[in-house]
Amino acid sequence: VTSPQVKYIHAGKIYDSNSGKYHSNKTIIISENIISSIEDGFIDPKNDKIELIDLKTKVLLPGLIDFHVHMESESGGKERYINRFQDSKADVAFKSTVVAKKTLLAGFTTVRDVGGSGVNIALRNAINKGVVDGPRIFTSGKTIATTGGHGDPTNGYRADLVEDPGPEDGVVNSISDARKAVRYRYKNGADLIKITATGGVMSMAKNGQNPQFTEEVMKAIVSTADDY
């Protein structure tokens, strides 16, 4: 029988977010990637199968959570717009793995990815399976918007270059469309539903304050999501 993977971390200081205080000279014991206990003092490993990580000069804190990220579009810089025309889904996926690792190394262990092409769902799955390094992801997959609204993926394009998007693409204009869009996201493995209920930087609206959904359509989205 293989013994469980155990790690000891010698922490100079640990920030306790519950009390708002720092605790000095602690040993964090990790068993099978789960923190099993935090002990006083610096405890030496019992055998050479236990990995020791020396962070006596460092300050440790619980993992941070970012509630609004877009892992697919964080890379690219000035070329981000032209990349929408040139990058395949594979290109987007490879670039998003780099962003995921940078996010984790920055201290964010959980993020909520609210809107993308659907690659964000595959990225979440790859991280959960240990294929790539990254934070725990809760994702909406593609957002849900109205025609011309904030989140319509065809905004800004000539009409002859793109087809009229529908519920699977995240564009709805009726109660029936709304229910179908939510069901597509459930089918594709989304953790949550994102709707862009008002205008924004990606919409054709003159301002971001006016509603873009009817109340009936929003109720249909919420009630359908609640079914799952």
Label the model's feature ranges.
Residues 81-94, 157-180:
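Active-site mouth loops of central-metabolism enzymes
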Residues 12, 28, 33, 57, ...:
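Divalent metal-coordination and catalytic microenvironments
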Residues 4-5:
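Boundary of Sec targeting at the N-terminus
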Residues 58-129, 147-154, 216:
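Metal-associated gating/positioning segment near the N- to mid-region
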Residues 70, 140-144, 198:
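Active-site beta-loop-alpha junctions enriched in small/polar residues
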Residues 177-228:
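Histidine/acidic residue-rich metal-binding segments in metalloenzymes
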Residues 125, 129-146, 208-228:
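Alpha-helix-loop-beta-strand connector modules within alpha/beta enzyme cores
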Residues 14, 19-61:
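Histidine-rich, glycine-flanked metal-binding segment
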